[in-house]
């Protein structure tokens, strides 16, 4: 888990959040054990920005991976920063319900871990479209 947290911290340092000043880093482990990180990228046209989890997923997909097996997320200060609803659904596309999502302080101290099912109960996923 420490490698995920370190990657999320490094990604957070690159976040582009000039409007909200809320800097987020996320890192995800894929099915091969590789770590993919992302940061939030705000835009003056607010809804057009990217969440950190979204940019980490993009990195994971571009590498050829198809599964998320573990996640770390950290935001500002000591505030619990969980993925937003949209990112929970995006993670769901690539992860099983028992995947752990570790929420940390900006300096990497673990605050709480959740399963994806805890954050997104009774979710809709790819199997619903078969």
Predicted regions and their residues:
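Short, solvent-exposed cationic patches
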Residues: 51-71
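Short beta-strand scaffold segments in enzyme catalytic cores
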Residues: 21-30
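C-terminal binding/interaction regions
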Residues: 1-17, 66-130
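Generic hydrophobic secondary-structure packing signal
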Residues: 4-7, 11, 22, 34, ...
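Compact, glycine-rich, soluble single-domain proteins
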Residues: 39-54
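Short acidic-glycine loop/turn motifs at beta-strand connectors
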Residues: 30-32, 106-107
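Glycine/charged-rich beta-loop-alpha catalytic/anionic-binding loops adjacent to active sites
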Residues: 32-43, 67-71
